[in-house]
Curated annotation (Swiss-Prot):
Protein name: Phosphoribosylformylglycinamidine cyclo-ligase
Keywords: ATP-binding, Cytoplasm, Ligase, Nucleotide-binding, Purine biosynthesis
Stored InterPro entries: PurM-like_C_dom, PurM-like_C_sf, PurM-like_N, PurM-like_N_sf, PurM_cligase
Pathway membership, UniProt: Purine metabolism; IMP biosynthesis via de novo pathway; 5-amino-1-(5-phospho-D-ribosyl)imidazole from N(2)-formyl-N(1)-(5-phospho-D-ribosyl)glycinamide: step 2/2
Biological process terms in GO annotation: 'de novo' IMP biosynthetic process; adenine biosynthetic process; purine nucleotide biosynthetic process
Subcellular location: Cytoplasm
Assigned EC number: 6.3.3.1
Catalytic activity, as annotated: 2-formamido-N(1)-(5-O-phospho-beta-D-ribosyl)acetamidine + ATP = 5-amino-1-(5-phospho-beta-D-ribosyl)imidazole + ADP + phosphate + H(+)
Cysteine disulfide partners in this protein: none
Lineage: superkingdom: Bacteria
Length: 346
């Protein structure tokens, strides 16, 4: 070493290993609450281990990864970090239930320019809360402190989930047929999609996020955590013949419903079967957004759309409502020509 130059450390370069260790200690309790019996070992290993549940005869693993998009920018601006982790889990696990899978474990990636232990602990505690709601284990993760890559207190998160489904019980839309009923399961708000348009509407309209709307502020409506449909969804799948499930995320109705429909079929949606929650009405009015664009960008109050035999529809709605969900018959499956759109909203 040169005697004239100071001795540099990783901390001098902007990476605080001690802060990372402090974060691990802070989140251990939250992570432990999510543990499933299949999980082997604890935090700190190079890899996380998980056995397959023994109840499955022909288990198929189902994986998913997602983020929360620019909803995160809104959370950062409002300094509210405790529910963004729930959003992260929801966006991943809800994609698994679409195929009938039970989530087993979840991993997270948290990246920031300068690690704030309090903020990171809030986010990861939210992830643990989401995992508890979904019944999956938070089995590991990565916290990356990357000076020069993020501005100020900014951070980003990504999630990764693995679930399991019996091979013979995979839901892939192949059983959908003309005459099937379509059931909607209500959302808690925009969930985690369309937030670039949300932020543009806020900017152009100069709206105040503290303005009150139906008993809550606009900001509270917009940061409402994404609903997690795992427990109600698994119960529904166990008791009814589910032909398809569509998770209404980015691309809205027009893009997500066709993903689970076979050729020659279309979803006919009764647009009068529900009233859009007030936040969607507010967004449409403030942004002068066309109804077509609303259905293309937002869930408009519908988190899942489920296809099943018509004679099971009422019982399925009753089951979902008993599980605490808002649910209703929203339409049906009809025959479609090859040149027709696969979604029709009346």
């Amino acid at each position: 070493m040169s005697g004239n130059n100071p001795s540099l450390s990783y901390k001098d370069a902007g990476v605080d290993i001690d802060a990372g260790n402090a974060l691990v200690e802070r989140i251990k309790g939250a992570v432990k609450r999510t543990r499933r019996p299949e999980v082997m070992g604890g935090l700190g290993g190079f890899g996380a281990l998980c056995e397959l549940p023994t109840k499955y005869k022909h288990p198929v693993l189902v994986s998913g990864t997602d983020g929360v998009g620019t909803k995160l920018r809104l959370a950062l601006d409002m300094k509210k970090h405790d529910t963004i982790g729930i959003d992260l889990v929801a966006m991943c696990v809800n994609d698994l239930i679409v195929q009938g899978a039970e989530p087993l474990f979840f991993l997270d990636y948290y990246a920031t320019g300068k690690l704030d232990v309090d903020t990171a602990a809030e986010v990861i505690s939210g992830i643990a809360d989401g995992c508890l709601q979904a019944g999956c284990a938070l089995i590991g993760g990565e916290t990356a402190e990357m000076p020069g890559m993020y501005e100020g207190e900014d951070y980003d998160v990504a999630g990764f989930c693995v679930g399991v489904v019996e091979k013979e019980e995979i839901i892939d839309g192949s059983k959908v047929q003309v005459g099937d009923a379509l059931i909607a399961v209500g959302s808690s708000g925009p969930h985690s999609n369309g937030y670039s348009l949300v932020r543009k509407i806020l900017e152009v309209s100069k709206a105040d996020k503290n303005e009150r709307l139906a008993g809550k502020t606009i900001g509270e409506h917009l940061l409402a955590p994404t609903k997690i449909y795992i427990k109600s969804g698994l119960k529904l799948i166990a008791e009814h013949d589910i032909h398809a499930i569509s998770h209404i995320t980015g691309g809205g109705f027009w893009e997500n419903i066709p993903r689970v429909l076979p050729e020659g079929t279309k979803a006919v949606i009764d647009g009068k079967s529900w009233e859009w929650p007030v936040i969607f009405q507010w967004l449409q009015e403030k942004g002068n957004v066309t109804t077509h664009e609303m259905y293309r960008t937002f869930n408009c109050g519908v988190g899942l759309i489920i296809a099943l035999p018509k004679d099971q529809a009422n019982a399925a709605v009753a089951l979902l409502q008993a599980e605490g969900e808002t649910a209703w018959v929203i339409g049906e499956i009809a025959a479609a020509n090859s040149n027709e759109a696969q979604v029709e909203i009346n």
